Design a protein with these regions (language model features):
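Glycine-centered hinge/linker elements that transmit conformational signals in sensory
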Residues: 173-174, 213-242
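Extracytoplasmic "Venus flytrap"/periplasmic binding protein-like
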Residues: 53-120, 151, 155-162, 259-260, ...
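A structural signal for short loop-to-beta-strand junctions that line the ligand-binding cleft
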Residues: 77-78, 85-86, 115-151, 180-184, ...
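Extracytoplasmic/periplasmic substrate-recognition and gating elements
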Residues: 52, 56-57, 62, 156, ...
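Short, solvent-exposed loop/beta-turn-alpha elements that line the ligand-binding surface or hinge
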Residues: 107-120, 186, 203-225, 273-275, ...
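Short, low-complexity disordered leader/linker segments with a strong preference
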Residues: 1-34, 56, 113, 344-347, ...
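Hinge/lid segment of periplasmic solute-binding proteins
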Residues: 91-144, 168, 174-176, 195-197, ...
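Conserved C-terminal helix/tail region of periplasmic/extracytoplasmic solute-binding proteins
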Residues: 154, 330, 357-411
């Protein structure tokens, strides 16, 4: 696949990299100091535990975690300032793609570390970057779909829907019974993007973005069905879809105020803070009436990369190898309600048991927003569309913003 990146930005980054100062150091007692920079504030405590264990087992290496607010922006700033951390943990996003294309990460293509993880998730990284080289090791994955309240489903005699028509029929039955079918939380624009991700991956697919990069297709041509169905879902929300945010939704759903919640696996722990005894289930959003085509939206929540300029690549690899040990991977995904990229490590939480067959069968598709540059402003664009309901205007805006970003990156 042809790379789509800013020639200007990549060139500047390459020049900076060649003159970059490195983060790793060795103190007077010959202890190697490594900086681990990661972007998830909710994962800081989990990584602190693992780092403490690693440091104890490796007295000649000391890993220190850095986890700033707005981490991706901070990381890009640090690249410009020639201060790339030794080890980086981040999502497989457009930011990762740009940084990988610029050459700041160590090439791990033939490294034994990759043998510990499922190759399907390595391919996800290659798809995002458009590169054959592998510059990150998938560590943890998240998933998006529909969380449902098992007690409400049982009370209303509802079954898990397998097709789009069944999903709408299930929502209608809940509505007829006086139960909110879906608790939407569109006050937060990123929440409005969740159905777009789920349906875009299943109905359109990831190959669309390869073709869009090459100007072979458009959102206007490919995303009509996604847009129409996302509007249809709005008929089964509550009275204040755009007045409630993510935290409101977690509280409401935890208190049994809705049957279903289009959400990510990251919300499970938040819902349980409200109601530890709630019985939850999880299923992929069935975007079509062909059950065999239903895929689970799942992507690399955290990948592990090493600076190409670190003074201590072998010690950095030791830390990555440690994190990829099954025991440590299991500890992390259990605490974070995530899924592991490590072969043989499974999420055992009963609430997500319905998703495991999709992982096992490889019936997963990446989050489509991983392929959309942040400058396109997808989230507020989707949010505005759901309010004004102008399908053609919405898709036209996505195409125009995409083309603007492409032009800037090509200059």
């Amino acid at each position: 696949m042809r790379k789509w990146g800013s020639a200007g930005m990549v060139t500047v980054l390459l020049v900076l990299i060649l003159t970059a100062c490195t983060g790793g150091s060795t103190n007077g007692s010959n202890v190697v100091q490594l900086e681990f920079f990661q972007n998830k504030p909710e994962a800081k405590a989990s990584f602190d535990e693992l780092i403490a264990k690693f440091n104890k087992e490796h007295p000649n290496i000391r890993v220190s975690q850095v986890n700033p607010p707005d981490a991706e922006t901070v990381l890009k700033t640090r690249v410009v300032k020639n201060a790339v951390p030794d080890i980086i943990g981040m999502g497989a996003t457009d930011t990762y793609s740009l940084l990988a294309q610029s050459g700041i990460f160590l090439n791990l293509t033939n490294d034994p570390l990759l043998k510990k993880v499922n190759p399907q998730y390595v391919q996800m990284l290659n798809d995002v970057t458009g590169m054959q080289e592998v510059t990150g090791v998938p560590f943890a994955l998240n998933a998006s779909g529909i969380i449902y309240n098992k007690a409400i489903f049982e009370k209303l005699n509802l079954s898990v829907p397998k097709t789009w028509d069944e999903l709408i029929a299930t929502a209608q039955k809940a509505k007829d019974a006086g139960v909110i079918p879906f608790y939407f939380t569109y006050k937060d624009d990123w929440q409005s993007n969740l159905p777009f991700n789920d349906m875009g991956g299943s109905l359109v697919g990831i190959d669309f973005y390869k073709e869009r990069r090459e100007n072979k297709t458009t959102f206007q041509a490919a995303y009509q069905e996604v847009a129409k169905k996302q509007l249809e879902l709005l008929n089964y929300g509550h009275s204040d879809n755009f007045g409630k945010g993510y935290s409101d939704g977690n509280r409401a759903f935890g208190n049994g105020q809705a049957a279903m919640y289009i959400q990510g696996s990251w919300a499970i722990s938040e819902i349980r803070k409200v109601n530890p005894d709630i019985k939850l289930g999880f299923f992929p959003l069935p975007a079509s009436n062909d059950e065999s085509q239903t895929k689970l939206t799942a992507g690399v929540d955290t990948l592990l990369a090493i600076s190409a300029q670190t003074e201590h690549p072998e010690e950095a690899k030791q830390f990555l190898s440690f994190l990829l040990e099954p025991e440590n991977s299991q500890q992390y995904i259990d605490q974070q309600n995530l899924f592991s990229a490590v072969d043989g490590v499974q999420q055992k939480d009963d609430s997500v048991s319905g998703l495991l067959p999709y992982f096992e069968q490889g019936k997963i598709v990446d989050f489509v927003d991983h392929y959309i540059p942040s400058a396109v402003q997808l989230n507020p664009t989707v949010q505005a569309f759901l309010q004004n309901k102008d399908i053609n205007g919405f898709l036209s805006t996505l195409d125009k913003e995409w083309d603007k970003v492409a032009a800037r990156r090509a200059s």
